[in-house]
């Protein structure tokens, strides 16, 4: 059983343990059973065995995580108590999707789906207990707020001539192929930001994070490549983006949307992830696109 230590807990838009009085009621959360559990693998067995090249991890996806969440509410009257129960039943409705955030020494959050009706196992008039069961499809904890870093995209050397020796990230130009131009760089000075063609982002957790990648045109299909230099992953995309087009790639769900249209079948290569620690993502482009942008949005991710 996870001990709460009176940490402030937010479930959806309801706050617990923060000392505020809402309509004559004080809301407490003292039970987060399962919060400290780590993700377990779901074993998939095939009677035909596995073919060459199949990654073992693909056959052992992570199980969902179940939690029991509960606490108590102090009320000024039985009438206020009934109103508080109605409020909890409304906000903790069955099959609703909520985010649970615990403000501890390291604030963490988890997205859950309510899988039972809220229960009130004990009621003494001036206070009552509440209990609800939830399921987290993605069993890892994330930071309450994401990191979002944007970089612009250039290919030609003329842009980098504006940099002096005081900014040595792009001093040496290397034309390694007729399609993709790359640059040698000192990225130590860009550990938390976005530079032309490059995003340096840190995952401060201890589990792999899966970012949302947003690309804004104009970009010519197959004229660019997204590379995570820290993991060796590479992704190309065979679709033109106009100046008003925005492509959103979800690397966890492995989906890509151009507006409301699913276009993940244009993706070739790897769906990149962010390993714990520093990650360097670089866009290699063959055509100058000063109006094009890439934004990487990611949460720090923990195993527990």
Regions inferred by a protein language model and the residue ranges of each:
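Short polybasic amphipathic segments
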Residues: 3-15, 20, 97-100, 223-227, ...
